[in-house]
Amino acid sequence: MKLFQYNLIRFGLIINVEVTHMEYTKESIHQIVLNQRAFFNSGATLSIKFRKEQLKKLRKAILDNQEQLIQALHEDLGRCEAEAYFCDVGDVVMEINEYLHGLSRWAKPETHFSGLACFPSIFTKVYKMPYGVSLIISPFNFPVLLSIGVLAASIAGGNTAIIKASSKSKATTAALVDIIGKTFPPEYAIVIDGGHDIADYCLEERVDKIFYTGSPNVAKHVMEMASKNLTPVALELGGETGNWCIIRKDANLKDAARKIAFFKICNAGQVCININQVAVAEEVAEQFINELKAAIIKQIGEKGYLNEEYPKLITKRAYQNIADEAEQYRDRIVFGGEGNPETCKYSPTIIYPVDINESIVNHEIFGPLLPIVVYKDNEVDSLLNTIAEREHGLALYVFTKNKKWAKRVMQTQQYGGGCINEVCLHLMVKGVPFNGVGHSGMGAYHGIWGFREFTHPSTVLFGHTKMNLPLREHPYNKKKKNLLSKFLK
């Protein structure tokens, strides 16, 4: 048994927390929440100086242990070193840096003129207040970025944090338990391992903010549990009908194919903003398919599942689900369709043509299968109407030379974020939100948006003790009524 003691000299408070390496129970989870609430109520997390110190500790911990994390990501997901750093470790360091650079400015109280109606008050402040104890439930597909990146937002907001990491990404979760355990006392931040039962123990607790990343079905359960305590929730989901990519007949097909191939190879398609299906104009469909095949072959070879750099699916069950779905479309597989169940690697697979109403384009695939839907270019509005009628995706991508049309689509469709003539890079832009809508989520984070997600505004009017406003007091007369009507215009 390991005993942590955190001595808060400034507040005269000592908190003793016992943490064992045994499996968590309902009682031990409850005790962690109580200890974190006591720590938060001590006021220790409120100062900007403290928050920045913790963010720097977090950054140092990630950088000092990046080899351990990269190795764990390879073990869990088969990632090569470059992809592990680019998609997880490096990304999270960038995220922490953004919080460090902007926190003082974002956290500064806003000052507003109170207005004549509030005379003699002159000014009103809006304070950005932390929620308290935050619960972060992270997925397996980007187990560092989607846990530590959210933790950074929670820290920046002035909260404590409990991270329920995925039980599927075993090696990375074990590494995070070790790294965060060495970096922070558990009454401030802790990573918890375990299955659905442990997640439910966490959700049963009265925490102050929940941030969940995962599937819409589980998100409904999270919201149901959160509703019992009216706990505010942020959800980052993939969307039930996935993310569309639309290719017009005037698109640069070679460029589009190269980018789509890269993205579908990334993490073997296990990406919440990945392209779930492509809709390509029939006038250029065959040419696009040929370009896409060539792009995949150039990047990982004709048999991608044999390439050491190509990632694997997270579990044998995930592999089997992908293999089974591909088998249903065996007669329309024009590329790929092969894998190795022992390594859990399944090649990028093009399925063509697919009707827009078939099941494979009506759910999130979360793997390396890519169904291709064909439409007539002059009937693109019909395609857009069909997409709009379905559950909103986390991302939308369009490839075209017609920028005016592309902008119109991006301003009229419902989706989380997206790109014109590009894929996924909107995720990397500083200062912009990452979010979903409808079945792809609610709330937003990254940079200032993450700070906002983990804080709530509190408005405080500063009154005057030597002056008052008799106009608002009884008894009322015609003169007061006339003056009030002028003040309140």
Please place each PLM-identified region on the residue numbering.
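Low-complexity, intrinsically disordered or signal/transmembrane-proximal segments
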Residues: 5-6
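N-terminal Rossmann-like NAD(P)+-binding subdomain of aldehyde/semialdehyde dehydrogenases
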Residues: 13-124
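Conserved C-terminal structural/oligomerization subdomain of aldehyde/semialdehyde dehydrogenase
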Residues: 23, 46-50, 246, 346-489
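Structural signal for hydrophobic packing residues in well-ordered secondary-structure cores
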Residues: 40, 44, 59-62, 66, ...
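Rossmann-like NAD(P) dinucleotide-binding subdomain of oxidoreductase/dehydrogenase enzymes
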Residues: 115-255
